[in-house]
Amino acid sequence: MIIRTATGDDWPRIWPFFRDIVAAGETYAYPEDLTAETARPLWMDGHVVVAEEDGVILGSAKMGPNRPGRGAHVSTASFMVDPAAQGKGVGRALGEYAVKWARGAGYHSMQFNAVVETNTGAVALWQALGFRILTTVPEAFESRRHGRVGLHIMYQEL
C-alpha cells in the first residue's frame, strides 16, 4: 500500500465510498443528499491523500489547519476508508501519514473536532497514535443506529 497525494482524477474512485460512508449515518455529519459534484469541494480541498494498492483506492485523508489565522498552528485531518478495505491497516497508515505530515509542515499540534464516540475503532486507533480525548460534546451527533451520541474532541501535541 502506498500513500500518495490525491489528484482530481482520483475523485471518481473516492466518491463511491465517501457516498456510502455518509449514507450510513454513523461517522460523518455531511448532508446525505450530496452529489458527487457538491461533495467534491468538501473533500478535495487542502492536502488530500489516498491509500492505494494495486491501483485500487482503499481510503483517503484530508489535512490542513484546524482554524484560520491565530488558530492555524493547530492542524486537523479527516479520514475515510472504503468499508471493503477496513481491517487492513488503511486507517492506521493514513493516520500515521497525517501526523507525520503535520509535524513536517510545522504544526504545533493536531486536533480532531468530531470523532463519534460510537466509532470505537477510530477512537482506539487515534488513542494508539497518541491522541487523547479532551472532552466529549454530549448528544452532538445523530447516529442512525444509536440515536444521539457524543462527539469527542481529540488532541495530540506534535
Residue ranges and their predicted role:
Residues 112-122, 140-142:
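Conserved beta-strand-loop-alpha-helix junction that forms the acyl-donor binding cleft
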Residues 15-32:
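Helix-loop element at the rim of GNAT/NAT acetyltransferase active sites that forms part
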Residues 127-137:
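Conserved acetyl-CoA-binding loop of GNAT-fold acetyltransferases
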Residues 46, 148-153:
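Short hydrophobic/aromatic beta-strand or adjacent loop that forms the aromatic wall/cage
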